[in-house]
Design a protein with these regions (language model features):
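PLP-dependent amino-acid enzyme catalytic core
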Residues: 1-495
């Protein structure tokens, strides 16, 4: 039986449904399973399968307590007509390399892959304490993309409410409008005075507050859960697209079964790339996973030195979704790389909490570095790469993907190993930055920038983004970090 426990202790023993409903462990750790890797996905049978079929193969290994009927229903509901490409995450040639587009979902960012299915998972979980009236309040901090994708996934979902916090003034105009215009009777959106790390840390504190939990349960029949990638139900759907990429490379006759592939992944919270590590543990032939960061290059420093130090300046950059100093999902990778040493992980995370830094043992770092590569791009390089990619390939990339594109250009190429760049968001979410980079007009609004970009490149803005210009703003709340808990409590009472 596959059970889940915290990265920091083995006291819990939860099913995947319980772990998904709970979100985060009581001790602040993240849910992991020790059986990861015991069962492999059959790579030889991937070619020719649809995304939905591959999702079933992968998720039935990772979430064995969901029945075949439940999983198929979740997959069918999540990966249907709301996607603009039937391949869901299509792989396309990009010069001598490949790009996997993760932005064809309803909110134009890679988060849709997981956040279209997470609410379906949640709907098939049951209350832990037997309270038949129990409702779930999803509480999430966003650096830009998660918020809208979570809102779109959970809007009007039965028995569920959602509250999203984002750092005031630190997301793009398009991202902010995507959230503030969200429809749905069970949704709440609030800006926070602070940066993403402040908001995410406060959300983690809210989850750890037993008194608040007791009040919410007794007053409102509400339990809290998370839609951030700390929730294992957010992470596992992302494993699927690594297998899908491999299937598409097989179909395009780029590789034969068993050939290794490298993936270059723009990431801040480490979830997107951790999914690639999970794919490798499930038998996918992954040679290297390369972390691409922006100027907030805490992961680059960690992977080169073995010391993780969040005591550093926080930069607000043109790739806002990666402006993160506390990379939550790294904890799961450290757990597996330390041979599942919960005591070590608890100690490292305590050091991070207390001193703002930790250092991993040298042998463990060597093991990590044998799989994970790393690089980062500053803002000038990001702009140059958006232009370079357009000039060389006639392909428009957003500023996050451009970090990955830069790192990929810097890496030595092995002609025998295909490289796949994960493209995490539509360029139309950041039209001003993209236009600046391409030397196009940026004098108008973000929406005028979209039209200029479409005209100049012969591409089309996603209708949901272009339509934001005339959408009604429903939410304009702003709170201090200290006011977040009160905001959640009010939202829970209204559920």
């Amino acid at each position: 039986m596959t059970t889940f426990h915290s990265t920091r202790s083995t006291t819990d023993s939860l099913t995947s449904k319980q772990a998904i409903r709970k979100g985060i462990a009581d001790d602040g750790g993240l849910f992991v399973t020790d059986s990861l890797g015991e069962t492999h996905v059959d790579v030889a049978s991937l070619a020719g399968k649809s995304y939905q079929q591959i999702a079933f193969d992968v998720l039935s290994v990772l979430l064995p307590d969901f029945s075949e009927t439940e999983l198929k229903a979740c997959i069918d509901e999540a990966y249907g007509a709301q996607w603009s490409d039937e391949k869901i995450t299509p792989v396309k040639p990009l010069g001598d390399d490949y790009v996997m587009e993760l932005f064809n979902g309803p909110t134009s960012a890679f988060k849709d892959v997981a956040l279209q299915i997470l609410p379906r998972f949640m709907a098939r979980t049951t209350p832990a304490g037997g309270d038949g009236n129990e409702k779930i309040m999803i509480v999430t901090a966003t650096s830009g993309d998660t918020g809208k994708a979570a809102l779109a996934g959970f809007a009007d979902a039965e028995g569920t409410g959602i509250t999203v916090f984002y750092p005031e003034g630190k997301v793009s105009q398009v991202q902010e409008l995507q959230m503030s215009t969200q429809a749905g009777s069970n949704v709440n959106v609030c800006a926070v005075k602070g940066n993403f790390d402040d908001a995410q840390s406060a959300v983690k504190r809210i989850f750890g507050d037993r008194e608040l939990a007791n009040r919410l349960a007794s007053d409102s029949h509400v339990v809290l859960s998370s839609a951030n990638s700390i929730n294992v139900g957010r992470l596992v759907p992302q494993v699927v697209y690594y297998f899908s990429a491999y299937a598409q490379l097989l179909e395009q006759q780029v590789i034969n079964v068993g050939d290794e592939v490298e993936f270059v992944v723009p990431t801040g919270n480490f979830g997107d790339i951790l999914a690639g590590y999970y794919a490798k543990l499930l038998g996918l032939p992954v040679k290297h996973l390369v972390v691409a960061s922006d100027k907030n290059n805490v992961l680059f420093d960690f992977l080169t030195s073995g010391t993780y130090n969040r005591q550093r300046p926080f930069y607000q950059t043109i790739s806002p979704s990666m402006d993160i100093l506390i990379s939550s999902n790294l904890e799961r990778m450290l757990y597996y790389m330390s041979d599942k040493d919960t005591r070590l992980i608890a100690m490292l995370m305590n050091d991070l909490n207390q001193w703002g830094a930790y250092e991993v043992p040298e042998p463990m770092l060597a093991k990590i570095r044998s799989l994970f590569g790393t690089g980062w791009a500053d803002e000038d390089q990001v702009r140059e790469m958006i232009a370079d990619c357009w000039n060389k390939n006639h392909y428009v990339i957003d500023p996050h993907t451009a970090c990955g594109y830069y790192v990929m250009q810097q890496m030595p190429r092995d002609p025998l190993t295909p490289r796949v760049l994960l493209s995490t968001a539509s360029p139309y979410k950041f039209p001003r930055v993209v236009n600046e980079s391409l030397g196009l007009d940026v004098s108008g609004t973000d929406f005028e920038c979209m039209d200029v970009l479409a005209e100049a490149t012969g591409t089309t803005a996603p209708a949901a983004l272009r339509g934001l210009e005339t959408a009604d703003v429903r939410f304009d709340h702003v709170v201090d970090i200290d006011g977040m808990e009160g905001f959640v409590e009010q939202a829970a009472k209204a559920l």
